[in-house]
């Protein structure tokens, strides 16, 4: 019989920089998970993605064991890296803070495709383009 899940924890952590300090420690500690083991395993699995924020979904079971699934980085982080900006525009309708090309947009859409609710790259590009527009990033042809 399968183990029963007692908790589902969602965190967004910097790749290969998870520590037992908040927010990881309190989130996992209240469910009795070995925090140090999780941090070590997370850091090992995200070692190649340094500099990005990687969301993780942790399933905690009755016997206090856990499994976790790494998601793709948020589109806003990927767009900010591509446009070489620190953050989006505070007034995206009037102030443009950067720009990316259609090729960069397609690359980001390909990265995000597994986590989006679509299977077509054209639809994924529209989703990511909407995020870019809301950040004040313009798309160049």
From Swiss-Prot:
Q: Which domain of life is it from?
A: Eukaryota
Q: Which GO terms describe its biological process?
A: translation
Which Pfam families does the UniProt record give? Ribosomal_L11, Ribosomal_L11_N
Provide the GO MF annotations for this entry.
large ribosomal subunit rRNA binding; structural constituent of ribosome
**Principal location class:** plastid
Keywords attached to this entry:
Chloroplast, Plastid, Ribonucleoprotein, Ribosomal protein, RNA-binding, rRNA-binding
What is the name listed in the Swiss-Prot or TrEMBL entry for this protein? Large ribosomal subunit protein uL11c
Source species: Phaeodactylum tricornutum (strain CCAP 1055/1)
Source organism phylogeny: Eukaryota, Sar, Stramenopiles, Ochrophyta, Bacillariophyta
Gene of origin?
rpl11
